[in-house]
Amino acid sequence: MVTTEVRTAVSDKEPLQRSPELDSSTDFLDNDRLKETFSSGALDFDEWTLLISEIETTSFPDDIEKLCLVYDAFLLEFPLCHGYWRKYAYHKIKLCTLEDAVEVFERAVQAATYSVAVWLDYCAFAVAAYEDPHDVSRLFERGLSFIGKDYSCCTLWDKYIEYLLGQQQWSSLANVYLRTLKYPSKKLDLYYKNFRKIAASLKEKIKCRIDVNGDLSSDPMEEDLVHTRHTDEEISIVVRELMGPSSSSAVSKALHTYLSIGEQFYQDSRQLMEKISCFETQIRRPYFHVKPLDTNQLDNWHAYLSFGETYGDFDWAINLYERCLIPCANYTEFWFRYVDFVESKGGRELANFALARASQTFVKSASVIHLFNARFKEHVGDASAASVALSRCGEELGFGFVENVTKKANMEKRLGNFEAAVTTYREALNKTLIGKENLETTARLYVQFSRLKYVITNSADDAAQILLEGNENVPHCKLLLEELMRLLMMHGGSRQVDLLDPIIDKELSHQADSSDGLSAEDKEEISNLYMEFIDLSGTIHDVRKALGRHIKLFPHSARAKLRGSRPSGNLFRELIQRREKTRERLNQDLLTNKGISSIVDSPPKEKKESSLDSYGTQSKDAVRADYVNTEPNQGCLTSGHLVEGNDNVIERETLCESQSDLSMGLKANEGGKRSHEVSLPIQASPEHGFVTKQAHFSSNSVDTVKSDAIVIQPSGSQSPQSYQSQESLRQTGRNRYHRRDLNQMHRDSKPRSQERPPQMPYSPVGTGREILGQHMAFTHQDNRVALQSSTSQNPQNQFQNSALQMHPVVQTSNAYPQSQIHGQHMIVSPPESQNPQNQCQNSTSQVQTSFAYPQTQIPQNPVQSNYQQEGQMQSHEAYNQMWQQYYYSYYYYQQQQQLMSEQPQPNQNPQPQLDQNLVQLLSKQYQSQAKTQYLQPQQVEQVNTQQQSQEPQNQQQIQFQQQQQQQEWFQQQQQWQQQQYLLYIQQQQLQGEAKGDEQRLSMPQGSTTNSDIQKSQESGAVNEANLSSDTSISSI
């Protein structure tokens, strides 16, 4: 029986008496019901704790049998709950004998061998209950042998030191102080101080003995300490000599060795403590609980274990693993790691013991631990134990059932038990074929069984038979059909086509309802896979048969293949939308710059809004009209060059409908009049950081006639001589506008392969208004000249830009010679005449010009010669009008120069006045640009360099230089005009001689045609000669 002192030490409460009223209300807690509940495993941790609290405090506080039943069942499930072991032992102390309490503690240390709290409770019980001090000391030593290396075992060390001090066991106390320094702990520094104190007391004892006996030996504390390694047996001998009745010299030597061992232990522990302090400080829960640990805690333990494995102390690493498995007992990953580590170090017994604890107690419900145990047993050669362990892996249906069966059968195959492997699958299939709810599990088992059968027998027929059996037991299963086709595709070959085709045909022709059969998507996938198989293994007859069935069942797939992919129809719509955005942005920029620009707006009648067709795209006429009437920005008018920025590039790329669209320069206004537009190639130079682009026009031969030309008249004038030609042009233009609309339908289908070249915009000039920076610029780079003409505000006489396309070398045969300005070919021809004899086509011309309106077809038969003189007269009139327009434009340009230099005229429109500094800056910029336009490229570079390095020169000097340069240029133009006129007279003479020969001939039509061809060739040769002479003159 337990003594009264033990009862008092364990519990201060008096035993509670059972109340009779509770007997009737606690029938549900009878032992049989409790055993049934415990065996079912239906209780979780919280329910267990509630049940124990109910029995202890209310129902059966003194029923030791019921308490033992509950505690035994609970601690079997959760053996690491040291608090419940202590409570269970206290119940034994109160209600049973001391031996019963000792038995409980022994079970506790067996279940939780490395738990500091369990050993502390056990030793505290021993100090209070045991009468023999040696029994208590042996219990302390036993516990310290397991947990003495634990970082948190200082509580047990403190309890042991307290007990030894009470018992005055100095020899044992000296040994304990030395051992506390061997491994790092929370109180390592405190233990070292106590060690130094006991060493000092021993030194005083030795000094007293020396004084009494007169021993002259040296003081051991003054000698150098030599650090050497000592075993536990040697340490015990040293302590025995130190505390025993030995001579002073022996005691002094023992004390020196004792101090040396202590210092070595402390230094080593201190170094190790510095390394593990980072891990120890992150441990938040060193005890067991069912609540999961956070990720940081788990990662810290993994890192701590990795350090322990590499440190080199196997015993300390084992203690670290055992300490980790207390809070991490529910994590199988740590058990796997522990077993692998100790097995790699040769501790197979420790590995088996760890696996037994994990698979039977701590994580026994996890199938992975049983699988790991089985593979470990198989690895060590224990096949029977491996089979037993594998039998515990989820034999019940549910999650992981197929995997467990497969692994068990594969293990039997590895062990050579082929029949046992087949039996494993057969037993599992018998379980799954009982109900229809396990059809998916059954199909997966058949797939794995077929693979195992092929590996064992190396026969595709045997494996296919397993799958055919599965298809009969689990009909309309996509998984089995796919596995069967893949198996036969890899191993069966053509001999299995007759076997597989009826099965596939049956599945595809089966009419699926809501509960049976394959879906339409599954059928299509099965049919596609079968066509792959039949294409690989079948004949052409089989392929056509399978393809016909597939198209019949799934016609949409065939249509998709035949139709293919087409480009999106929204590309053109997006292009038109980008055009609209670009045009709106340009208009906004023009409105923004209107304060410093003096551009005269176009008449409202000609500013038409772009219309959209039914598909949301803008018509070509609207786009062309909007583009032609768009006002140029201030930069273009001021500099005289066309600077190509990003917006201009987008504008030209998107608005270029076709090559022929660039050549159309006529636009009918609402008043019936026609405005003429002329645009020439422009040589732009880099200026103000922008990259300018060379304007390059190319002619288009579509719907063009060589005799078509454009009438150029001075602005604001209509001479009587030109009225007849203009009226003829109006009549012809009305008829051709209808044809141009028809020709646009043909041009839409042509690719837009050419980038729209930049054009120099021309705006009309109003009376009394000054256009700031508007002038005529001539450049000599690449033999190109940009001519800008100014016209009146009258809508009937207004000149607009024309998109004439030219190349540097263009040969045309018209009624008059081509006008050339410094190597540039500018085409100017009279209005269309009804006399086709005046239209001489040049067969050797490389590029034909494309005029501003569609051309009418010219009959090939010659007409009466009385129209010849009228055509020549019109040619002379057009030639005179061209040079009259040129002189007028040049005179008007000089007037603008003078007005600009003297004083700026106020704008007619109510606009805010410019700042005087801004006006001066714009004037200087305009004058510098006008100067550089008439210089050679080398001179332009010199002028730019001088302008950057020197201050701006006087305005009068710049104007004087400009006038001199203009006079020199005008003299050159007069010489060139005379040469051109001589060439023109020669050409007219040659044409007159050729036409006179035609009139003298009176041959049939067939011979006339041959002679015309010969004469046209001769005329082409003459034109080539004239062209070469023109080129030479222009180069001069």
From Swiss-Prot:
<protein>
    <recommendedName>
        <fullName>Pre-mRNA-processing factor 39-2</fullName>
    </recommendedName>
</protein>
<feature type="region of interest" description="Disordered">
    <location>
        <begin position="714"/>
        <end position="767"/>
    </location>
</feature>
<feature type="repeat" description="HAT 4">
    <location>
        <begin position="168"/>
        <end position="201"/>
    </location>
</feature>
<feature type="repeat" description="HAT 5">
    <location>
        <begin position="278"/>
        <end position="310"/>
    </location>
</feature>
<feature type="repeat" description="HAT 6">
    <location>
        <begin position="312"/>
        <end position="344"/>
    </location>
</feature>
<dbReference type="Pfam" id="PF23241">
    <property type="entry name" value="HAT_PRP39_C"/>
</dbReference>
<dbReference type="InterPro" id="IPR003107">
    <property type="entry name" value="HAT"/>
</dbReference>
<feature type="compositionally biased region" description="Low complexity">
    <location>
        <begin position="714"/>
        <end position="726"/>
    </location>
</feature>
<feature type="region of interest" description="Disordered">
    <location>
        <begin position="995"/>
        <end position="1036"/>
    </location>
</feature>
<feature type="compositionally biased region" description="Basic and acidic residues">
    <location>
        <begin position="740"/>
        <end position="755"/>
    </location>
</feature>
<keyword id="KW-0507">mRNA processing</keyword>
<feature type="repeat" description="HAT 1">
    <location>
        <begin position="62"/>
        <end position="94"/>
    </location>
</feature>
<comment type="similarity">
    <text>Belongs to the PRP39 family.</text>
</comment>
<keyword id="KW-0677">Repeat</keyword>
<dbReference type="GO" id="GO:0008380">
    <property type="term" value="P:RNA splicing"/>
</dbReference>
<feature type="region of interest" description="Disordered">
    <location>
        <begin position="595"/>
        <end position="618"/>
    </location>
</feature>
<dbReference type="InterPro" id="IPR011990">
    <property type="entry name" value="TPR-like_helical_dom_sf"/>
</dbReference>
<dbReference type="GO" id="GO:0005634">
    <property type="term" value="C:nucleus"/>
</dbReference>
<feature type="region of interest" description="Disordered">
    <location>
        <begin position="1"/>
        <end position="24"/>
    </location>
</feature>
<dbReference type="Pfam" id="PF23240">
    <property type="entry name" value="HAT_PRP39_N"/>
</dbReference>
<feature type="repeat" description="HAT 3">
    <location>
        <begin position="131"/>
        <end position="166"/>
    </location>
</feature>
<feature type="repeat" description="HAT 2">
    <location>
        <begin position="96"/>
        <end position="128"/>
    </location>
</feature>
<keyword id="KW-0508">mRNA splicing</keyword>
<comment type="function">
    <text>Involved in pre-mRNA splicing.</text>
</comment>
<dbReference type="GO" id="GO:0006397">
    <property type="term" value="P:mRNA processing"/>
</dbReference>
<feature type="compositionally biased region" description="Polar residues">
    <location>
        <begin position="1002"/>
        <end position="1036"/>
    </location>
</feature>
<keyword id="KW-0539">Nucleus</keyword>
